[in-house]
Amino acid sequence: MGSRSAKIAAAVETYLYPDADFLVDLHSGDIHEMVVPFAFFPVAAGETVEKKAAAAARALSLSWRVASTAKNGLYSWAAQKGIPALLLERGGLGRWTEREVDAYRINLYELLVHLDILPESILESVKGMNLKDSESSPESEVLPSGKIEQREIRIMRYLEAPGNGFWYPAIREGSCL
């Protein structure tokens, strides 16, 4: 029958994906690091899916969107099935703040407006909505429109240490190197 995880994955693929027009996966960084809020969008699932996902990422008040070639996660497998998808990252260290939850709520409303599910006027009525305060990244630049200037990373590089041990970052998330 497979592991519990395999059963969950099969249920998602069988019951969720066939009816999905768009998928968004919310994450909270990794247990070992803090991250600047960003969105992964799939680039390994064809031009149509990539364009729809990238346009959706651009509609969100996040500083970064990152092209992803992943093929085996919830959002990336949805993309392989022809469903535009995003993975949003915010926070880290296995915890979250109310501000991060509020920022995710705003991002979800922004996505629903982008997908023409809700009218743009709904954004103003979201309780406590303030785009200038929704982004926790120290290097964010809020444009006169209230939107956050967003940049794109086309090639993601992961650094790996040559040996085992503990990682103690010497810089904070969002620092310019």
Task: Describe the function of each predicted region.
Residues 1-177:
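Structured catalytic-domain cores with a bias toward divalent-metal coordination
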